[in-house]
């Protein structure tokens, strides 16, 4: 399984958990993730671990390139749930 983790800040616990699932590539922004998908092919899943507008921008970059890749947005701001639907995130989790 090939997973893209988009997170500006390093969250070691979450990253370690995801790395157990398979190959994880970490990106500081959605644009770099999009470049990697163009260069190396699609990911099995993209996980955005950013809050608020930054997370929304990550999702916009990913969805601008691919509507098919499963997209999980993890945030601590529940008020961004409507934006997650608009960005067509497959799952929005509040932690």
Name every feature range the model reports, one short phrase each.
Residues 3, 71-72:
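Hydrophobic/aromatic residues located in beta-strands of well-ordered beta-sheets
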Residues 5-32:
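Two-component/phosphorelay signaling modules centered on CheY-like receiver
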Residues 7-8, 73-78:
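Conserved active-site segment of CheY-like receiver
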Residues 10-16, 53-55, 79-83:
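Short, charged/polar "capping" segments at the starts of alpha-helices
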Residues 20, 67, 87-88:
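Short, structured coil segments at secondary-structure junctions
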Residues 33-34, 42-66, 77-78:
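Conserved phosphotransfer microenvironments
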Residues 46, 71, 92-94:
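Two-component signal transduction core modules
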Residues 57, 76-93:
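Alpha4 helix (beta4-alpha4-beta5 surface) of REC/receiver domains from two-component response regulators
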